């Protein structure tokens, strides 16, 4: 059921990673100043009423109530949102909603999130005090992953990325034990119970959405958890969820476009589930901020002119497609008069690319990427060098490798992130923060194509 860290084949590899890291293991945790102002707004009064009733709701009713709160707050401009946050007293149920909006917009919080009876995080008192940068890892770390079963292929790069962070750290490290969930709800619950019984003081995992939902639905979770996916219920108190989901990319794309004043967006997508989910998230986020998706059309649509010529025009195009499909769409966008409009895609754009002579047509399209693969991250050797020696860090797996590395960082810095208004970690997947509801908010790096090669996007917002 479990695997100890003493695996020779892994140890030498990650010892090598530790030795080659320029600044091994030191994450960047920074602070930003805040300003104090006071104001009030009727939209906030309505949102506050909903927030006060939120704790009494559950399931779909609670989800819809929270969406209504988000929609109301999204109508406030940045200055008004900041003023209202400053005016809310400690313990007001609305503060965590307002704070999350501020965080999503890259704005400072006036104070830390309120840790309420619904959600709070507290590290084990037995841990040694935190270092000056907030580093305070567990004493004994359990990692719950599907090391066998249908998700084992996805779990391998997550495991290796986590171990790269672990072996690259030169300060105190916890004992680490891997538990196989078999990729099932039952296997997850059994693995968690075993990890708790064996004295682990923190759990990373599980990985699958159904596994996370099963764990979050458990009556009691005596050991805090960093789940590596979103469940179908909110994280229970003491647990945090971190994920790389299509919804996250849709939201990131919406925020990117909103920052560039794009209010009317044409969405083009393929047929798979992740592409549909990204578009749905984009549409919801734009709608909440007063913008809109004018049409959602399939990647095989022959003539885009009728959609481009609608009254009000098109400000930008969102592409939830793979690179091969995007190459066929670019000439159609030009024929429809949309060649000069901002174009944003999901990270799937990279799929099916790699030949610059073919990919030049993709030049200028912005897409979310990982800090590590797009420009490097402190604490990890450059991605090409790691990929040369480690198959689980190559190609599409590099994203999951970076995800695993960040899971290690979060396990070590979570207390700092949950307890300070100005704390963030510069991770391998992007800039990481924790909101007042137990969710890790990730601001991705951004990339584009130049001469057919993916490169960092210099003018993208990196809040």
State the predicted function of each range:
Residues 383-458:
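Segments of small-molecule ligand-sensing domains
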Residues 239-297:
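An alpha-beta-alpha
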